[in-house]
């Protein structure tokens, strides 16, 4: 499995998990976050390996569709880059640093 795809799916899952069904959440989390094989997930849920594969592929598409419409992950990346640039340019500005910490904590809320 490609590490870039795994990282992206894990990130998209963090942003959009609440929009998925329980089954979709379980399969994606086991497959990407916990590194279960399709066979292990199939055994765990008493379904075929093909059923797990199909569900994961559909859920990947759903996550990508959510990102295309909502841009939560890509916006988060841009905000993080801007915060880093501000902190680098104004390292001694305590007010800016405090405000960025507040904004970052809002972004990282669960």
Curated annotation (Swiss-Prot):
Gene3D superfamilies: Winged helix-like DNA-binding domain superfamily/Winged helix DNA-binding domain
Cited InterPro entries: RNA_pol_sigma_r3/r4-like (IPR013324), UPF0122 (IPR007394), UPF0122_fam_protein (IPR054831), WH-like_DNA-bd_sf (IPR036388)
Source organism, top-level taxon: Bacteria
Job description of the protein: Might take part in the signal recognition particle (SRP) pathway. This is inferred from the conservation of its genetic proximity to ftsY/ffh. May be a regulatory protein.
Family (UniProt): Belongs to the UPF0122 family.
Alphabetical list of HAMAP family matching this protein: UPF0122
Name of protein: UPF0122 protein SP_1288
Organism: Streptococcus pneumoniae serotype 4 (strain ATCC BAA-334 / TIGR4)
């Amino acid at each position: 499995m490609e590490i870039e795809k795994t990282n992206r799916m894990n990130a998209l899952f963090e942003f959009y998990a609440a929009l998925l069904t329980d089954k979709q959440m379980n399969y994606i989390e086991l497959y990407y976050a916990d590194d279960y094989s399709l066979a292990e997930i199939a055994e765990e849920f008493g379904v075929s390996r093909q059923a797990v594969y199909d569900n994961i592929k559909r859920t990947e598409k759903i996550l990508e569709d959510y990102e295309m419409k909502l841009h939560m992950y890509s916006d988060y990346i841009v905000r993080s880059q801007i915060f880093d640039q501000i902190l680098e340019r104004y390292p001694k500005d305590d007010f800016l640093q405090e405000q960025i910490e507040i904004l970052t904590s809002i972004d990282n809320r669960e």
